[in-house]
């Protein structure tokens, strides 16, 4: 049972890392002048996706980093015991 729990935690953290990488890229893309506006002008769907990713990344980035840091501290604590 413990192995299944650890596996699910690892899978969840991996998904969270991938989401944080995507949201971080979305935030960086917003900072590059011209790219965001040209993509949103060229395709309505791409503009909506970028807008959603911008909102999602703003909401998700800080809590995601805190969750990853807490998992890292927990892992270090378990190794020391």
Curated annotation (Swiss-Prot):
Q: How does it sit in the membrane?
A: Multi-pass membrane protein
Q: What is the induction note for this entry? A: Expressed late in the viral replicative cycle.
Q: Name one Pfam family in it.
A: Pox_I5
Tell me which UniProt keywords the record has, alphabetically.
Late protein, Membrane, Transmembrane, Transmembrane helix, Virion
Q: Where in the cell is it found?
A: Virion membrane
Gene Ontology CC:
membrane; virion membrane
InterPro entries under this entry?
Poxvirus_I5
Give the chief site where it resides: virion
| Record-stated family | Belongs to the Chordopoxvirinae I5 family.
Q: What is this protein called?
A: Protein I5 homolog
The organism is: Fowlpox virus (strain NVSL) (FPV)
The organism's taxonomy opens as: Viruses, Varidnaviria, Bamfordvirae, Nucleocytoviricota, Pokkesviricetes
